[in-house]
Regions:
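Short, low-complexity disordered leader/linker segments with a strong preference
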Residues: 1-7
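Residues at or immediately flanking beta-strands
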Residues: 7, 38-42, 148
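Extracytoplasmic "Venus flytrap"
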Residues: 7-25, 46-50
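Short, polar/charged alpha-helical segment
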Residues: 17-42, 159
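Contiguous mixed-secondary-structure segments that line small-molecule binding/active-site clefts
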Residues: 29-32, 60, 70-167
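Surface-exposed patches in mature extracellular/periplasmic domains of secreted proteins
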Residues: 41-46, 69-70
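Short helix-initiation/N-cap motifs at beta->coil->alpha
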Residues: 44-57, 153-156, 169-182
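Paired acidic/hydrophobic, glycine-rich loop segments that form the ligand-binding mouth/hinge
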Residues: 65-69, 169-170, 185
Length: 185
C-alpha cells in the first residue's frame, strides 16, 4: 500500500475501551476510507502522548493534531471556560447539553479562538459529573474534613474541595492509581 500523504496524531489519556478513544478510532477508519488511504489518523490512548495538560501543550506546539481533554486542564489555557466547571451550575447532564446546544458552545469556541492559545475546540461532550469516592461514607460536608481528594489541575476544582474542608490533591487522572497505592490519596 502507498504511504499516506498526510499523517495526523490524536491523543487521549483514557483506555482503549473508553468512548472517546472508540470515537477517535472510528473517525480514523472513516478518514482512511474517505481519503482512500491518503490521510491517516494515528490514535494513541493510555496517555502514551501524555496526560491532558501535555496533550494540550502538544497541540499548541504542533506535535499532536487532536486530543480530548477535560475542562479542568483546558480552562488553564482559556480561563473563561472555567464557568462550565463551577460546582452545581447544572442540574444534570441534560441541562448541560441544553445549555451547550443553545449556542453557548459556539460562543465558547469563538472565545477560545480570540484567546489565540494555539488550538481550537472541535466539539463539546459531557464526560459525566464530579463525584467524591471515599473509603468511608460522606453524609454531610463535615464528613469531608481533611480527606485527601484528587482534583484536576485547575483552581476551580482545587478551591471547591478546599472550601468544603477536604484537602485537594491536584494530579492527572492517570496518576491516581499509584497515588492510592503510595498513600498520596
Amino acid at each position: 500500500a502507498a504511504e499516506p500523504r498526510l499523517v495526523l496524531r490524536s491523543g487521549d489519556d483514557s483506555t482503549e475501551e473508553y468512548p472517546y478513544h472508540i470515537a477517535f478510532a472510528a473517525w480514523a477508519e472513516a478518514i482512511d476510507k474517505a481519503s482512500n488511504g491518503e490521510i491517516k489518523l494515528e490514535v494513541y490512548s493510555n496517555a502514551v502522548l501524555g496526560y491532558e495538560r501535555e496533550l494540550i501543550e502538544g497541540v499548541q506546539m504542533g506535535t499532536i493534531d487532536f486530543c480530548t481533554t477535560s475542562l479542568g486542564p483546558f480552562g488553564s489555557f482559556a480561563p473563561q471556560i472555567n464557568v462550565l466547571s463551577l460546582p452545581y451550575i447544572f442540574k444534570d447532564v441534560d441541562h448541560l447539553i441544553r445549555i451547550l446546544d443553545s449556542g453557548l458552545s459556539y460562543k465558547m469556541n469563538a472565545y477560545i479562538e480570540e484567546q489565540n492559545v494555539g488550538f481550537l475546540s472541535l466539539g463539546w461532550i459531557c464526560g459525566g459529573g464530579r463525584c467524591f469516592y471515599t473509603k468511608k461514607p460522606v453524609y454531610s460536608v463535615k464528613d469531608l474534613a481533611n480527606l485527601k481528594i484528587r482534583v484536576m489541575e485547575n483552581d476551580v476544582y482545587i478551591n471547591m474541595v478546599n472550601l468544603l474542608g477536604a484537602k485537594a490533591v491536584p494530579m492527572a487522572y492517570g496518576e491516581v492509581y499509584s497515588a492510592l497505592q503510595t498513600g498520596v490519596l
